[in-house]
Amino acid sequence: GKILAAQYARENKIPYLGICLGMQIATIEFARNVCGLAGANSTEFNKETEHPVISLQEEQQGIVDMGASMRLGSCASTIYPGTKSYDFYGQTDTIHERHRHRWEFNPSYREQLEKCGLTIASVSQNEGLVEIIEIADHPFFIGAQFHPEFKSKPNQPHPLFSGLIAASLENS
């Protein structure tokens, strides 16, 4: 159901903000239905997938005991000019966001997905891991590998939440 929901939002221009797994689901959906990578998946769900567009980081692939092996805490990322996310963040080049996950966008598929129209809006500064994806010709289709809810406050929502609300109001 999650992949179908992401597809429905993408195809019908409904604002979509995928957080962590939601970003991964959006990537899987895009790979399958836009790039034609039948069976694209996450190795979390199918270790034998033909197209592992979401996978464990290479250095974690041999870890059997998963305890304390997550990517946790704040991480500096470069955000690219010309993206919606760059505008939402106030046109700053560096952002700091908090993480709690193991699986990542597989860099082996980056070029192929970009050729199909997926925009990589942000990557981590140390590892070069994909942090934000977008679809440029969509009113608001953004996936964030991090957790923007960790930096939101009642009177100061995270920029991506503000962007989602604004896009929802404009497209209702």
Specify the residue positions occupied by each region the protein language model found.
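A broad, low-specificity signal marking well-ordered, structured residues that form hydrophobic/aromatic
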Residues: 75-77, 142
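Short, surface-exposed acidic
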Residues: 39-43, 92-99
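Conserved beta-loop-beta connector loops within the AMP-binding
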Residues: 84-93
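Active-site rim elements
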Residues: 72-75, 96-100
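Acyltransferase
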Residues: 91, 98-172
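Cysteine-nucleophile active-site neighborhood
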Residues: 1-75, 82-84, 154, 161-169
